[in-house]
C-alpha cells in the first residue's frame, strides 16, 4: 500500500500554445496517493487541456511530467495507460456501435487461445462493473441506444475497470442523477482507500465537501492557488476562479398568461417494449415571456417530451399540439421550426454542433434561408446575419471563422443559442443548457434567458439541477416514468415537494 502522503505524479511548468491563445502558462500540479485533488476554474481556464496532457491525449509544448519521480514522455493515451493513468472525459469518447461491454474493455478484452475475444467472460466482467455502478442495462446493449447519463456511467466503468493508479475525472456528474452521483462517490472513496490518486474537475462546488482533499484553482491558463479543502470558503473559491464576486442570477417572474404553445395527451411509445411508453399522456402549456422548467430523474421522459414537440418521433408519438391557439402538425424538425419552435439539445457536441465547421457556419445552420440569394448562399449575408447574434450573446471567439471545436463549452453553448435564436422562434426549448459549463458561463446563460423572456419569448427548460430549475422558472412541471406528476407555481415550489413529485407515482396532471 502506498502511503497517502507519497507523491505519485508531478507536472512542472507545463505550457501549451494553440493558434491565437496560450492555453497553459507554466502550470505546476502535484498528485498524492489516496487523495482527491479538485481542479477548479472557468471554462477556458485550461483545466481540460492540462488533463489531456496528463492523459497522453496532447503533448505539452514546454514542461516536464514525472510518474513516481521518473520523467515520462507520453506520445499517446496508451502510453499514459501503461503508467496507470486513466481519464473519464466530459465529452463522451465511447464507440456508439459497440456494446456496453465492448466499450468498457476496449483494447483490453479477455481472450481465448490468445487470439479470440472471450465474449462470455467479457460480458460477465462488464456486468460486475454495471452492478457496482447500479446501472440497469445489459452489457450487450449497443451504446448508441443509451441516454447521455447512462453513457456517462459506462465511461466511468471503463476507466475504473482498468488497473489505475491515477484517475482523471472531467465533470463526471454533469449528466447523471443524484442517486448515481452517490454511487460514484462511494466508488471514489473505495479508490482512495486503495491508494489511487484522483484529479476531479467540477463546477458543482457543493460536491467538494463529500470528496475533496486538495483544491487547485486555475484561471486563463495559469495556476492561481492551491489549498487543502476547508481552508477556502465557497465565495473565496469563486473569487479565485473568476477574479471577482459572482452573484447567481434568478428569473424575474412573468405575469403573462397568454399561452404560446399547448400540448395535450403527448405520448411516445417505447421502441422495444410494446405497450410501454417513454412519455405517456402529458398535458402542458407555456406562455409568452415565461420559463416553464421541467424536472425529473433520469428516465423520466423529459428529453423525449421535447423531442416529440420538435417533430423527432412523428410515427411513434401521439397527441395534439397548438401554437397561438391553432392546431399544428409536427412531422419533422422542419415543421417545428416553421411553426416557431427551436430545440437546444442535451448533447451539444453530438447533436448541436458540426465540430469541423466554423463558429459562423454553425451559427447560421438553422437559418440559411436568410442568406439565400438566387438559390445560392451569399456568404456576406450569412456573416452579417450571424454576427448580430454572436455579438448579442457575447461569444468569445477570435473571429467567425474560428473552428467551433476550439471554443470553451460555455461559448459553444452560446453559439447553439445564437443558431436557434437566428430562426426567430416563439418557443425556445433548452435541454440541460448549463451542463458542463462554469458558474460564470451559467450566469451568462441565465441572463440571456431573462433578456429573451423579457422580449416575449417562451422558454421550456429541462434541467437536472434542482436549484437551477427553482431559480430560473416561473412554473415547474415534474415528470416521473414518462408521466407528469405535479405542477408548481414559482411561489409554492420547494425542494421537498418537487423531489417528492419526482418519485414514482401514477397520476397525470395538466400543466
UniProtKB/Swiss-Prot annotation:
Catalytic activity: D-ribose(out) + ATP + H2O = D-ribose(in) + ADP + phosphate + H(+)
SUPFAM superfamilies recorded: P-loop containing nucleoside triphosphate hydrolases
Binding site for ATP: 41-48
GO molecular function, one term: ABC-type D-ribose transporter activity
Alphabetical UniProt keywords: ATP-binding, Cell inner membrane, Cell membrane, Membrane, Nucleotide-binding, Repeat, Sugar transport, Translocase, Transport
GO cellular component: plasma membrane
Domain of life: Bacteria
UniProt key word Repeat: yes
Compartments reported by the entry: Cell inner membrane
CDD domains: ABC_Carb_Monos_I, ABC_Carb_Monos_II
ABC transporter domain residues: 9-245, 261-506
EC number per UniProt: 7.5.2.7
Gene3D superfamilies: P-loop containing nucleotide triphosphate hydrolases
Residue stretches spanning the membrane: none
Subcellular location, principal: membrane
Pfam families per record: ABC_tran (PF00005)
Protein topology in the membrane: Peripheral membrane protein
Family according to the record: Belongs to the ABC transporter superfamily. Ribose importer (TC 3.A.1.2.1) family.
Subunit structure: The complex is composed of an ATP-binding protein (RbsA), two transmembrane proteins (RbsC) and a solute-binding protein (RbsB).
Role description: Part of the ABC transporter complex RbsABC involved in ribose import. Responsible for energy coupling to the transport system.
Protein name per UniProt: Ribose import ATP-binding protein RbsA
The organism of origin for this protein: Rhodopirellula baltica (strain DSM 10527 / NCIMB 13988 / SH1)
Protein's gene: rbsA
Amino acid at each position: 500500500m502506498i502511503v497517502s502522503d507519497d507523491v505519485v505524479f508531478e507536472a512542472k511548468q507545463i505550457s501549451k500554445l494553440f493558434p491565437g491563445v496560450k492555453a497553459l502558462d507554466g502550470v505546476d500540479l502535484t498528485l498524492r496517493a489516496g487523495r482527491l485533488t479538485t481542479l477548479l476554474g472557468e471554462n477556458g481556464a485550461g483545466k481540460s487541456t492540462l488533463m489531456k496532457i496528463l492523459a497522453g491525449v496532447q503533448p505539452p509544448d514546454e514542461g516536464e511530467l514525472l510518474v513516481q519521480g521518473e520523467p515520462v514522455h507520453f506520445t499517446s493515451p496508451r502510453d499514459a495507460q501503461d503508467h496507470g493513468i486513466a481519464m473519464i472525459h466530459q465529452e463522451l469518447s465511447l464507440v456508439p456501435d459497440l456494446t456496453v461491454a465492448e466499450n468498457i474493455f476496449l483494447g483490453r478484452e479477455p481472450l481465448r487461445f490468445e487470439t479470440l475475444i472471450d465474449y462470455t467472460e467479457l460480458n460477465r466482467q462488464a456486468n460486475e462493473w454495471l452492478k457496482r455502478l447500479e446501472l440497469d442495462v445489459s452489457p450487450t446493449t449497443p451504446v448508441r441506444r443509451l441516454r447521455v447519463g447512462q453513457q456517462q456511467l459506462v465511461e466511468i466503468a471503463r476507466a475504473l475497470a482498468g488497473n489505475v493508479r491515477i484517475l482523471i475525472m472531467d465533470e463526471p456528474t454533469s449528466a447523471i442523477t443524484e442517486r448515481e452521483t452517490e454511487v460514484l462517490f462511494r466508488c471514489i472513496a473505495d479508490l482512495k482507500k486503495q491508494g489511487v490518486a484522483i484529479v476531479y474537475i467540477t463546477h458543482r462546488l457543493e460536491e467538494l465537501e463529500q470528496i475533496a482533499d486538495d483544491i487547485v484553482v486555475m484561471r486563463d491558463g495559469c495556476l492561481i492557488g492551491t489549498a487543502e479543502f476547508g481552508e477556502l470558503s465557497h465565495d473565496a473559491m469563486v473569487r479565485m476562479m473568476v477574479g471577482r464576486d459572482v452573484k447567481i442570477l434568478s428569473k424575474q417572474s412573468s405575469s403573462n398568461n397568454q399561452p404560446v404553445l399547448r400540448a395535450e395527451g403527448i405520448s411516445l411509445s417505447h421502441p422495444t417494449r410494446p405497450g410501454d411508453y417513454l412519455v405517456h399522456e402529458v398535458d402542458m402549456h407555456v406562455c409568452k415571456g415565461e420559463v416553464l422548467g421541467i424536472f425529473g430523474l433520469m428516465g423520466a421522459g423529459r428529453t423525449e417530451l421535447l423531442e416529440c414537440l420538435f417533430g423527432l418521433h412523428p410515427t411513434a408519438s401521439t397527441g395534439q399540439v397548438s401554437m397561438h391557439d391553432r392546431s399544428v402538425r409536427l412531422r419533422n424538425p422542419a415543421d417545428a421550426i416553421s411553426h416557431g419552435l427551436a430545440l437546444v439539445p442535451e448533447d451539444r457536441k453530438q447533436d448541436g454542433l458540426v465540430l469541423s465547421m466554423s463558429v459562423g457556419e454553425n451559427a447560421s445552420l438553422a437559418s440559411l434561408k436568410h442568406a439565400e440569394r438566387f438559390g445560392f448562399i451569399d456568404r456576406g449575408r450569412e456573416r452579417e446575419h450571424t454576427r448580430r447574434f454572436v455579438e448579442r450573446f457575447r461569444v468569445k471567439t477570435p473571429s467567425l471563422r474560428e473552428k467551433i471545436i476550439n471554443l470553451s463549452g460555455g461559448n459553444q453553448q452560446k453559439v447553439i443559442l445564437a443558431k436557434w435564436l437566428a430562426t426567430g422562434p416563439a418557443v425556445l426549448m433548452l435541454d440541460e443548457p448549463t451542463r458542463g459549463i462554469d458558474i460564470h458561463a451559467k450566469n451568462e446563460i441565465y441572463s440571456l434567458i431573462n433578456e429573451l423572456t423579457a422580449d416575449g419569448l417562451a422558454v421550456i427548460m429541462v434541467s437536472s439541477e434542482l436549484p437551477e430549475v427553482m431559480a430560473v422558472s416561473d412554473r415547474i412541471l415534474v415528470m416521473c416514468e414518462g408521466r407528469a406528476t405535479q405542477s408548481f407555481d414559482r411561489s409554492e415550489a420547494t425542494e421537498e415537494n418537487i423531489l417528492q413529485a419526482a418519485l414514482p407515482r401514477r397520476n397525470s396532471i395538466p400543466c
